[in-house]
Amino acid sequence: MKLQKPKGTQDILPAESAKWQYVEGFAREIFKRYNYAEVRTPIFEHYEVISRSVGDTTDIVTKEMYDFYDKGDRHITLRPEGTAPVVRSYVENKLFAPEVQKPSKFYYMGPMFRYERPQAGRLRQFHQIGVECFGSSNPATDVETIAMAAHFLKEIGIQGVKLHLNTLGNPESRAAYRQALIDYLTPLKETLSKDSQRRLEENPLRVLDSKEKEDKVAVENAPSILDFLDEESQTHFDAVRQMLENLGVDYIIDTNMVRGLDYYNHTIFEFITEIEGNDLTVCAGGRYDGLVAYFGGPETAGFGFGLGVERLLLILEKQGVTLPIENALDVYIAVLGEGANAKALELVQALRQQGFKAERDYLNRKLKAQFKSADVFVAKTLITLGESEVESGQVTVKNNQTREEVQVSLETISQNFSEIFEKLGFYTQ
């Protein structure tokens, strides 16, 4: 048997992982500015944590979850999304307690799992970056969180992004709209796709965002949620729209957008960009004021979003955006002869302990091959260390770009390479 990675997964090799590290680090920096702190939850949860919160009738639960019974006969699932685990953690760890500052702001990053057909930007093990804010029902929280997502996408370089905005209202508004939608779609049931016929019985709002052609035709004249908002829901949505306009964040009202998870209420949103004629959602989220109470906590407002790292990187690649990744070595040490082996190890360690990114040859190769390695590593400086240099205690340090050289002692390199580095035209941080 040929051992290969499972279908729908990928190996993220060094050339790619540098991009991942950049995106993750960039997200952390943006989130810190908004006073978010990281939370890390298990990659598997009890099945009910996901099924009951996401919705028993959603595609995630009915078709896509990786679930199994462990050796203790506990029903376990690999997490398919990030919000439910964070809410579970919030409640279990009593972060709703009065002594915890509100709103409580958390971000997470990590792998998620869904059994679906693998395609570009969508894998069975995928990675998500997300945020969750607990304790504020203020529409300004909706807008701040959406603005933070827009801030991140703009600064990382995603182009042509459009914000699609909708509201699902409060539970009363949503229930009234749900019934109106059932009344509208029931006479059209036979024209719907098989999936949407099932959705009509279980979760009729999901018919609205079906990608099937026949479903799109059926919902063209469907009633709008905006016509079923009560005063509270209308006031909240009006405030969100006004504050987005105040911040200069453009948006499109999309009344057919409902999101795929059952826990949303009031504001929902997606950031969408067009790639090769297809609309791709790069970031999405919304408000979920009932989820904390559903998990056994007190009534607590919530708002958050998630974005897929694979899809984000795919869009950046398709748009020709080059991330500013620094892969260059500061120093490469070419080693000549067995007599220089031990000293080369001492020297490279001393450089690393001073904060320099350094490498040396370990393979006793000819100098030409070692110099080629220095070029592959884009080494800024090059030191050639042979037995004669070890004996004399003096060595040449070369700027590998300009070929400028300086003669220095091994002791100086070991104790203060910064001075030499700067003399050759480079700057230390």
Curated annotation (Swiss-Prot):
Highest taxon of the lineage: Bacteria
Gene (UniProt): hisS
Record-linked SUPFAM superfamilies: Class II aaRS ABD-related, Class II aaRS and biotin synthetases
One GO term describing the cellular component: cytoplasm
PANTHER family: HISTIDINE--TRNA LIGASE, MITOCHONDRIAL-RELATED (PTHR43707:SF1), HISTIDYL-TRNA SYNTHETASE (PTHR43707)
Lineage: Bacteria, Bacillati, Bacillota, Bacilli, Lactobacillales
Cellular localisation: Cytoplasm
EC top class, as a word: ligase
Major location (coarse): cytoplasm
UniProt name for this protein: Histidine--tRNA ligase
PROSITE patterns linked to this entry: AA_TRNA_LIGASE_II
Catalytic activity, reaction form: tRNA(His) + L-histidine + ATP = L-histidyl-tRNA(His) + AMP + diphosphate + H(+)
Alphabetically ordered keywords of this record: Aminoacyl-tRNA synthetase, ATP-binding, Cytoplasm, Ligase, Nucleotide-binding, Protein biosynthesis
Keyword Aminoacyl-tRNA synthetase: yes
HAMAP family: His_tRNA_synth
